[in-house]
Amino acid sequence: PILKNLGEFAEIIKVSGDIDCGLANDGDADRIALFDGDGNYIDSHHILLLLIHYLHKVKGWNGKVGTGFSSTVKINQLCEKYGLELDVVKIGFKHLCGIMISEDVLVGGEESGGIAVKGHIPERDGIWNGLVIWEFMAKSGKSLRELIQEVYNVVGEFAFERNDLRISQSLKEEIVANCQAGKYDHFGKYKVIRIDDMDGWKYWLSDHEWV
């Protein structure tokens, strides 16, 4: 459920004038995306932050947070603010599922929109997560945008964009070889300040920006 596949849905919400939140799932409903009442797309990073904020700060639940390598650093910041232990794992929900089965986990989720929460099954469930967010909206009496602002008040605003590129196998191999050799030290005018290579490569351009 990514934005480029949901243009018609976003437009329906935007023109309706009486929809507070839109919920989008993939075919087997294990992934989630949301839209606010103005038809603005809410990505998985914001949803993860909302769930952590609601379950811990509002409901008073505790537990470890697990997230994938490609998730926003804002999760690290929110967990630090709330005193929650954070595990960052390789990409793929199987790495989170193992933690959720063996440990006390509040929220486990990754950038692709697969999220699991405490009190439910240790597996992705997009519909359930949507219901939890709707519960948050109903009990608080606030809009989705207002709830996101609550999170921003703690960790600051941020933006995320994902672009999936179709490239030739030869170019892919060349890029991987360059990454392995450490050949990328800047992207355009942005200098790389550090590199994480837990699963692929994450090039940090500042403490809060990465490629």
Language-model regions: role of each:
Residues 27, 37-38, 47, 70, ...:
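Short, ordered loop/turn segments at secondary-structure junctions
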Residues 30-50, 75-76:
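Short Gly/Thr/Asp-enriched flexible loops that form oxyanion-binding sites at enzyme active sites
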Residues 26-27, 41-46, 121-125:
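Short glycine/threonine-rich catalytic loop with a Thr-x-Gly-x-Asp
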Residues 1-35:
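N-terminal small/polar loop signature for handling phosphorylated ligands or for N-terminal nucleophile
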